[in-house]
Amino acid sequence: MIRRPAMSGIVGFRRPPVPGAAGFPREEFEAVSRASPVIFFICPYGTSISTVRWAIQRLGRDGFHVVAYEAAKAVFMDGDPEILPGLIASVRADIKAQIARLTSEGVTEFGFFGSSLGSFIFYNCVGDAVPELRWGVFNTGGGIARGMWRLDGARRQHVMRGWSLARLEAAWAGVQYPEFGHLDGCRFVFVSSRRDKIAPLDNIEPYLGSMRQAGAQVSVLEVPAIGHFSTIVAGLWRAPRFVAMVRPAVGPAPAR
């Protein structure tokens, strides 16, 4: 097989953006080696891949092949609770398809890094759902309904359509409490801040019990921040360090 020429000193090759399942954009950043470990990366809510390319590039410098996704604001701003479960199912199916393709090309290791909404999507992509994802970073976490309810614009859209927080929590119970199946040997870290008003640190612990019962090693780390956005940015900046912490063959890395 002929190797493509390197297009950047940061990543080996950047494929043009393509629409994934359900129309969400997917962009791929190849490492120099085709057998490099792959990180699936989902952007924060309302954030484009281009906006967080700097974080993807930092992972590329460490030799990772990155497959990045973004989701439209419609997932919350349309005021339709059915969009979120559909988006999760579509992204999960696309990830499985990409894993099958990459495995056929010689890749043997897959992990993830998700921020904000992206973190929650990955919460529904581990265990029996996508068993190849053995390690990953949840950059913020907690209850999705309460987090969305704290977004003024999204809350108004749902209230206008007759939704209350209690009804929304019931509608999203299936994705808030997924059946993980087997997580034996998996390693995950949740990143958050006490000052994050959308997804605060103390909202994470109630959702970790089922992961641990399924066999996963799960830790929670606090980053210095003053709100949700700065929490996300702090986690993205430290992405290489957090990834190194959960990769079994690598162990903790120096602070960056």
Question: Predicted segments — roles?
Answer:
Residues 100-153:
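Primarily recognizes the serine-hydrolase "nucleophile elbow" in alpha/beta-hydrolase
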Residues 1-34:
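N-terminal cap/lid segment of alpha/beta-hydrolase-fold proteins
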Residues 81-104:
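Alpha/beta-hydrolase active-site loop
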Residues 197-218:
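Active-site-adjacent alpha-helix of alpha/beta-hydrolase-fold enzymes
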